[in-house]
Amino acid sequence: MPRLPPILRLLQAPAKFTVVPKAHVSAKPAKTPTSAVEQAVGISAIVVGFMVPAGWVLAHLESYKKSSAA
């Protein structure tokens, strides 16, 4: 057990000297504003991306239960 702290120090050493570049954050408004149609398409794509797989799993839950019991 006495060897654990030196090993942990070796693992932590590279993290101390890592240089993280500055993020380029802009506080300006967008050059081309996003239209309502673009926002609707984007939001619906995200909703479909999350809900379709969840719905698939819920719709086939009984078959998953049967296959795992065998």
Swiss-Prot record:
Q: Where in the cell is it found?
A: Mitochondrion inner membrane
Q: Which keywords does this chain's UniProt record carry? A: Membrane, Mitochondrion, Mitochondrion inner membrane, Transit peptide, Transmembrane, Transmembrane helix
List residues traversing the bilayer: 39-60
Transit peptide: give start and end.
1-24
Q: List the membrane topology term(s).
A: Single-pass membrane protein
Purpose: Component of the cytochrome c oxidase, the last enzyme in the mitochondrial electron transport chain which drives oxidative phosphorylation. The respiratory chain contains 3 multisubunit complexes succinate dehydrogenase (complex II, CII), ubiquinol-cytochrome c oxidoreductase (cytochrome b-c1 complex, complex III, CIII) and cytochrome c oxidase (complex IV, CIV), that cooperate to transfer electrons derived from NADH and succinate to molecular oxygen, creating an electrochemical gradient over the inner membrane that drives transmembrane transport and the ATP synthase.
What is the official name of this protein in its record? Cytochrome c oxidase subunit 8B, mitochondrial
